[in-house]
């Protein structure tokens, strides 16, 4: 079992996110519980390329300071929505014999959606903790509607198990105990 923290970067981890305070608190709690229970925390960063703020070398590219990686925790960089394409993450997870991935981060309707669906297609058991992903309003949907659409309709029971933070922590504790 691993905890993926996807694209929780300085530029986009802001108070404009849907349920921002709850999202930040839940991800912090999950990172702490993962570390306490021997569940590896893995970070993924998105690079939009030259000329964009969300690119290597820019302040907004860095992982959100509230979720800062501990020494030795892995960071994989990507240029597309899926963290599994050309990043080394898939090979790393396979080399460790991982079967279960807990997905948290940003944005629900972009990279989290791709992470969930691609993780499922690669044969992982995908677990999505409630209110541990978020997004912004867009011209077609409010952030709230996007969150509900993906977490309650699209993923749950199809590509992922969308469950409470408490249930995820319980799974982490069981994982530690064997």
What does each model-identified segment do?
Residues 8, 46, 131:
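Active-site loop/turn elements of alpha/beta-hydrolase fold enzymes
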Residues 48-52:
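Glycine-rich, proline-tolerant flexible connector loops at the mouths of alpha/beta enzymes
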Residues 9-15:
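Short acidic, Gly/Ser-rich segments with clustered Asp/Glu that frequently serve as metal-coordination loops
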Residues 15-17, 53-55:
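Short, glycine/acidic-enriched capping/hinge loops at junctions between secondary-structure elements
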Residues 16-47:
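A short alpha/beta connector and helix-capping loop motif
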Residues 2, 29-35, 54-178:
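Active-site-adjacent betaalpha module
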Residues 1-7:
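Short coil-to-beta-strand
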